[in-house]
């Protein structure tokens, strides 16, 4: 059953700081320890060809990763899921080297357990991910995954390649923790929210184009005082949203970026502090 979007009450804007919107200053993520595994997986419509390595199991509809490492994917997969389940103390890198993955029952990429996962978009390659309109959950009480790319833990998207996310069920790219984007040409079309980080969304680079039936970017952690923020320090972002462009519970900061929005709700809705540099946020004219 599809997840219905929630319409939040009007928020109070407490602080608006206007500063200069100067040159680019992308923040680079820290290094990731990925273990010894370095495997290639090639999709061929209904077939999956993969290196025979420990920690990687393959079936017709699932590629399951159980050990940290670097995993490179290419080709077209008509119906399947990349499942990462390596444990909360480990990290992995998923390299999308020209993939087109559809899942007719769930999410194409589901990070079930990991400390952190990086999704790297290979230079110049086109990648397309499309999820189901209705999900079949392993645990109906859990209702996870709930995004076309979904992670229970931290996720970073980087690189210079292209990524198109067609989210027919709920959110486009979602995580229960922190979502970071440092690069890539990313297009998201979402039935609900475009980018959803429960704890935070941080963008330091890339060209991002979001079309969402609800909010463009959404963060909603109210339980931890140091969480619940959106921080944009670089990149070019276009947001078309039927609700709000950016919705965050604690703070929204936009500097050294070009953000253009076309919305049915607010450009920015925030229950806390706003720090938006002059000239960094404007209307999208098309």
UniProtKB/Swiss-Prot annotation:
Q: What superkingdom heads the lineage?
A: Bacteria
Q: What residues does Ca(2+) 3 bind to?
A: 215, 243-244, 247
Q: Could you tell me the keywords of this UniProt record?
A: Calcium, Cell membrane, Lipoprotein, Membrane, Metal-binding, Palmitate, Signal
Lipid conjugation (S-diacylglycerol cysteine) is at 21
The record's region (Polygalacturonic acid-binding) falls at 124-225
Ribonucleoprotein found in the keyword field: no
Q: Which Pfam families match?
A: Cthe_2159
- Endpoints of the signal sequence: 1-20
Q: What is its main location?
A: membrane
Q: How does it sit in the membrane?
A: Lipid-anchor
Carries keyword Lipid metabolism? no
Q: Where in or outside the cell?
A: Cell membrane
- Lipid addition (N-palmitoyl cysteine) is recorded at 21
Residue sites binding Ca(2+) 1 per the record: 152-153, 177
The task this protein performs is described as: Binds cellulosic and pectic substrates. Displays no enzyme activity (in vitro).
The annotated subunit structure for this chain is: Monomer.
Under what name is this protein listed? Carbohydrate-binding domain-containing protein Cthe_2159
Instruction: List the top taxonomic levels of the source.
Output: Bacteria, Bacillati, Bacillota, Clostridia, Eubacteriales
